[in-house]
Amino acid sequence: MLDVKNTGVFSSAFIDRLNAMTNSDDGDETADAELDSGLANSKYIDSSDEMASALSSFINRRDLEKLKGTNSDSQERILDGEEDEINHKIFDLKRTLKDNLPLDRDFIDRLKRYFKDPSDQVLALRELLNEKDLTAEQVELLTKIINEIISGSEKSVNAGINSAIQAKLFGNKMKLEPQLLRACYRGFIMGNISTTDQYIEWLGNFGFNHRHTIVNFVEQSLIVDMDSEKPSCNAYEFGFVLSKLIAIKMIRTSDVIFMKKLESSSLLKDGSLSAEQLLLTLLYIFQYPSESEQILTSVIEVSRASHEDSVVYQTYLSSVNESPHDIFKSESEREIAINILRELVTSAYKKELSR
């Protein structure tokens, strides 16, 4: 289940829908994606409205708690090691904390040796702050170390903390190290690449079969992040991040549409072309619409022995036609791609009829 004790600004129906995504089997990846598919556009709009409402509510929230907070799950969010190993490390740090005052360099070195990721270091220190009978000096020193770790990298640290539970859940589902997923979420929050490049990057890093799951992971991590005591972004930044996520979900919608087109065509039957290769071609068309003909050249060269050119061109034309318009930078770029593809279809049909 989605690890949110207080769903905060989100409706229970929205949280239930997201929990259903996490609990779905691998075979239901396409079904997950279709929750925001252009084939069911009202669902996509509902999701966008929920996110807009969430952002509005986030802006109006009160100041959050100070450094120590009231979290009791700091240790559960640590990703560096198995549970028993983490328990041992935390126990050793607690023992060292009681034996050393003031805290010396050895304590800090041990902390960084045990937990290499800054988010895990902060979580471990917060766990120590929950210890009873700490002196005022110990609290002050632990707080100072936390502030030193966070200084200049607060967004990255908080993003790593807030995505940790989801990284564990999805890491288990995808058979991936949760640290990789945490890095993925950080990259999404802090990165500045185009949404199509982001989708291509995830496709390359996590594989064709996991591409929809990664979008679900990022979405759920973002929800937890926004609803956390110490979010990674301010309201303005979250607005930008939400717009990126919505754009990526539009690309996933196009992905779903395209896969349905491929399933109903003959392009995948002889094995000369892979679904991943064909999807990448579509993504490149979204990025460089004026070069659509050149982008399709490599596909045509491979497919020509088994398929008519018109089948390839028509598949891409109908997919672009049915995809959300805002995938393109402008309506004019979309029209450029459609016009080029339409001309290619017409030309291919004429050649095939003249044989």
Swiss-Prot record:
Q: Does the keyword Phosphoprotein apply?
A: no
Result of mutating residue 17 to K? In plasmid pCP301
Primary location class: secreted
List, alphabetically, the InterPro entries matched. Answer: HrpJ-like (IPR010812), Invas_InvE (IPR003520), MxiC_C (IPR049013), T3SS_LcrE (IPR013401)
Keywords carried by this UniProt record: Plasmid, Secreted, Transport, Virulence
GO cellular component labels: cell surface; extracellular region; host cell; outer membrane
The record, for Gene3D superfamilies, names:
1.10.10.2060, 1.10.150.630, 1.20.1280.240
The answer to whether UniProt assigns keyword Electron transport to this entry is no
From the Swiss-Prot or TrEMBL record, state where the protein is found.
Answer: Secreted; Host cell
Q: Which GO terms describe its biological process?
A: negative regulation of protein secretion; protein secretion by the type III secretion system
Primary role: Necessary for the secretion of IPA invasins.
* Official protein name in the record: Protein MxiC
Q: What is the lineage of its organism?
A: Bacteria, Pseudomonadati, Pseudomonadota, Gammaproteobacteria, Enterobacterales
Q: Gene name?
A: mxiC
